Amino acid sequence: FTPWKYKAGMHFGWFQVTAFQHDKHVAAYGGGQTWTGPTLISSFPDKRYNATYLHQYYRADRTPPAGNIRNYPSAPWRGGMGSSHPYLFKWVEKDRTHSNQYNSQNVVAMRYAELLLMLAEISNELGNGQEMTFLTPVLTRAGLTPRAEYSQGQSSFRDAIMEEYQFELIGEGEDSFHNKRRGYQYFLDLSLIHISEPTRPT
């Protein structure tokens, strides 16, 4: 799942993360700042950011500065379908000299971080006071401290942990299980990102 011309060898297919999901992540952990442009984004406090999103690179078959590929948010104009959303970087072949069409990258079935998030969610629902014990290691690994929503009661924690699943596990195929557990109405109201600009590319 490597973007076009990101590596030397021919390849087919890649994933993109919607700009709206990207912006939701940035808003959650951006500290109230406006994070725009590649320079600011590269110093974003959430360490998961650069491991999750790819929005600017130079083609492997060109010598920089030629072949500069820019997607949102490095291309903030969002002028076309291809550049309107960042690529998902998790499954990209990181070796840019890789010349084969296929690689032997493992597919993750489940991660320890997901287990910790589930235990935090369960603890919150049980009201046993253990939720931060499980959540803190996930946030610490990402270089983060708990945001305010985690200390504003059970309902607020519930909504925040459902967002944390998205930020931590995006592109790993686990969304449907967590959405199903919460129910269809919760999915419609809080899990789906409501687009307020229907005329922009989606």
Question: Where are these predicted regions, by residue range?
Answer:
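Acidic/polar-rich alpha-helix caps and helix-coil junctions
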Residues: S43-S196, R200
